[in-house]
Amino acid sequence: MQTHEINQRFTEHFRKAGHTVVPSASLILDDPTLLFVNAGMVQFKPYFLGDAPAPYPRATSIQKCVRTGDIDEVGKTTRHNTFFQMAGNFSFGDYFKEGAMEHAWGLLTSSQADGGYGFDPERLWVTVFEKDEEAAALWQKVTGIPAERIQVRDAKDNYWDMGVPGPGGPCSEIYYDRGPKYGREGGPVVDEDRYIEIWNLVFMQDIRGELPPKEGHPPIGELPTKNIDTGMGVERVACLLQGVENVYETDLVRPVIAKAEELSGRSYGANHEDDVRFRVIADHARSGVMLVGDGVTPGNEARGYVLRRLLRRIIRSTRLLGVHEPVLGEFAAVVRDAMAPSYPELVTEFDRIDSVMRNEEDAFLSTLTAGSKIFDLAVADTKKAGGTQLAGAKAFQLHDTYGFPIDLTLEMASEQGLSVDEHGFRELMSEQRRRAKEDAKSRKSGHGDLSTYRTLLDQHGTTEFLGYTDLQAQSRVLGLLVDGVPAKSAAAGTEVELILDRTPFYAEGGGQIADTGRLTGPGVEVEVHDVQRAVPGLFVHRAKVTAGELGVDTSLEAAVDSKRRHAIERSHSATHLVHAAVRSAYGKRAAQAGSLNSPGRMRFDFTAPAAVSGAVLGGVEEEVNSYLQNDVEVQSYTTTMDRAMELGAVALFGEKYGDQVRVVDMGDYSRELCGGTHVGRIGQLGVVKLVADSSVGSGVHRVEALVGMDAMRHISKEHLLVSRLAEQFKVPAEELPERIAGVVSRLRSAEKELEQLRVAQVLQSAGELAGKGTDVHGVTLVAEQVPDGVDGGALRALAGEVRGRLGSRPAVVALFSADGDKVSFVVGVNTPAQDLGLKAGKLVPSFAAEVGGRGGGKPDMAQGGGSNPAGITAAIAALRTGLDQAVARG
């Protein structure tokens, strides 16, 4: 049975049982506790926690999941995977234990002709929590399973909670007996290789309390409504129904291995080392495609770093299989074809996915070869010195110069029997490894922990947001935190966090920064400087009491800084229009990857399918400003997600949407799902002026623009600058480009003449340098440091002149010049030396690391640079050694 059919049978079984079929959530959700979605219940957490009412009593989903805690183990065995699918059914105060058992057992044991999976019930076992006697009795009642195939386990195995105070409950697992071939008799408590878990049923019935960590979180009561959360491992069921040993042989994964076999000419199963590489490719290709599909782009922080690490492990594994051409696009296409029946969006988004992955591959391949040579030399030096640990400085160089993630260096070193000085690496990376975005997010989340905010939400309910229509409102203080601790009052000068019953203040979200403003009441004044949604539905106002004493239950007049808010709204509306214009220019492949809307200025990141040209961006600016002339009304309304999609509304990758969504329309030109605030008519934007564009990551481009009066002031400054230049050059403004081009041309000619004079002066030393040659196994080597400040062009000319003066004898010329903290070097090899197999480009890696650099070139001439002038003497010695070895090898 194919995996897609397994999924179809699952959702159809539960649909017939009255469950709402909910699509898989994005792998990226707005949950600060999770890097990626790693379980089916994650998108339903607000309902289980009571943060929001469940919109349906029963639900079912096939959730895509990524777990990256054991990336290094992937491939070494067949057990580990980073991507998997979790099929689940969920009850929110509806059916409980008995119903969950009936649904699971029915699907597993019904015949395939009747829509089930057709498992032999005699080969199914179950486990229950040791204190859950009710579950053991119900299993026998519901299924008729004999008592000897029901095993009890302690809380470690069969009790679920979130690790913090909140809901919890016993769980019950269903296992399949694969037979004597796989291990000992006696059920899952004896052998979990033979008895494989396929389904876990969690019975959420308890409230877990707060105690010191070592004592856990014991039950302190029962939940008012009992819930069900189950998860069936799709890949495990696929293995059993397809009669294969592990996930790598199933219909969704084996095709990727087959493609790797085709590209490499090697066979899976021939030897362990290659099998590890095949499995790394197969697993990481699936994770990579699904993560990029959900809007993750390779980077150096958080999710982007994990994705980059996955993709670069694929690239290295393919090279170890002997494939040196770009391959990520090939693997991505195989994953798309295999997964599309369950995730059709992979087809519509494939051009973007393919572009992001290929761009990352191109970027890494450009440095992988050079970096690998540096690594090999470092390994050789370490072993030669009798060491067992690669220096932290070398790991840092590989990361900083060649883009090697530390994990890749650790893995490569381990393959060579070496460890890495991680402490030294971390010290060198201390500044670069500060994750600015995460730090900013943690600063904004306030002082209290999440349980404090959840308690406030439970006590007072969600905050009523009035800011779509009102910038002033009467509000009441429901809660007050000082240094994260609930307080009754706060004196002047105190930084506080406020919970209001209703607020006109917008909480940061969707790229729009938070409102600021004032709260005033009898004898008290408060300055609001930030607003965050600490937990869904709860607005936390970060503020400072500037006068009087603030207390809980105080009534206040809340007033948003209206001038600032309107400037932010202009920026946010401009972002929507720029997004529409970018999609008009590049198509749907240009998906939003991030935005920031602040007063008078907007920033928009998008995935670029190709290089972004200035001409296209100029067209984007013109199209936006042209549309502003229509002054259409901006409309917002709430509708169902399905209806919004029918209307063509653009949903953003990584965002979590409910059944009801807010749509912002700007005529037929722009229609997006958005919870932010906007202008009433687009004419209020005035003008949008693009002021910067740049690349901010693999396949991600950023444009920045000024809006309204900020844009007008910028244009006025530019006009004044042009006027002054025209006056200076004594030409009309329209002739400035031609006049400036002429001046630049004359300047370049003068610089060229000056360079020729410098070269002529440098060449005077050629005869002296040629006389300093030494013999290395019949090859004349001239390796010298010339005066400081000689640039690469002059060095090349000098090396060529010296090489020519050495006649027909095999010769190698290497010249170095320092300039401050930089080093330039050139290596020249004459034809007789090339006939001996010597090549300039091949000699560079033998010494470049000593000057902290790299280089390359052709057989006759190579050049490069570095950042360690103090290493020139060592570099010359290393070159001599490298030449000695190269000549000896012949």
UniProtKB/Swiss-Prot annotation:
InterPro entries: aa-tRNA-synth_II/BPL/LPL, Ala-tRNA-lgiase_IIc, Ala-tRNA-ligase_IIc_anticod-bd, Ala-tRNA-synth_IIc_core, Ala-tRNA-synth_IIc_N, Ala-tRNA_ligase, Ala_tRNA_ligase_euk/bac, DHHA1_dom. Its cofactor is Zn(2+). Signal peptide: none annotated. One of its GO terms (cellular component) is cytosol. Zn(2+) binds at H572, H576, C674, H678. The keyword Zinc applies. Its EC number is 6.1.1.7. Binds 1 zinc ion per subunit. It holds the Pfam family tRNA_SAD. One of its GO terms (molecular function) is alanine-tRNA ligase activity. It is found in: Cytoplasm. It is an enzyme of class 6 (ligase). Keywords: Aminoacyl-tRNA synthetase, ATP-binding, Cytoplasm, Ligase, Metal-binding, Nucleotide-binding, Protein biosynthesis, RNA-binding, tRNA-binding, Zinc. It comes from the Bacteria. Its main location: cytoplasm. It catalyses: tRNA(Ala) + L-alanine + ATP = L-alanyl-tRNA(Ala) + AMP + diphosphate. One of its GO terms (biological process) is alanyl-tRNA aminoacylation. Catalyzes the attachment of alanine to tRNA(Ala) in a two-step reaction: alanine is first activated by ATP to form Ala-AMP and then transferred to the acceptor end of tRNA(Ala). Also edits incorrectly charged Ser-tRNA(Ala) and Gly-tRNA(Ala) via its editing domain. PANTHER family: ALANINE--TRNA LIGASE, CYTOPLASMIC, ALANYL-TRNA SYNTHETASE. Belongs to the class-II aminoacyl-tRNA synthetase family. Consists of three domains; the N-terminal catalytic domain, the editing domain and the C-terminal C-Ala domain. The editing domain removes incorrectly charged amino acids, while the C-Ala domain, along with tRNA(Ala), serves as a bridge to cooperatively bring together the editing and aminoacylation centers thus stimulating deacylation of misacylated tRNAs. This is Alanine--tRNA ligase.
